């Protein structure tokens, strides 16, 4: 993947760097706990510090996308650290195809420590300074193809959803699709952008557990 070399030493702003200012408002709900915006920001900042410094070049971060707090923290952290995110489906075969095609510098998403050598290995790609996110197309034939999105495009899409649906800080949405689908990801983007909250759920709407 070669588009244009990023400006070394200049980390682009994260997607939701202002979220820490929302303090004790609830951002995320899981089966085990509630996480405030302040806690989510702190967890993301701590995780971001584990990624390679952007002064040595932006990396392509492959994240296995699941509706878990571990993934969400990794996702926000990778953006906050100034890197580019490639979302990977949790399905083994599909993930293997994307890894073989695009060779991310780091694969994460489950909150576990990053592999040894990540901080010292040079970047594998020249990444455009505006690039923030890569989403796989839904086509089932041919080589995997990616849709490129800038930070501006991601935020503009989230803002348009907020305005259209009238999302306000008191709203709470439950996840019904995994975040490697653009719709599933848009639920996270739109609600976190406007100070609302999300309930992280991995069950489909047809599963009895979804309604419990």
Q: Model segments located where?
A:
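ATP-dependent adenylate-forming carboxylate-activation enzymes
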Residues: 65-66, 86-99, 196-212
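Conserved AMP-binding A3 loop
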Residues: 36-38, 131-159
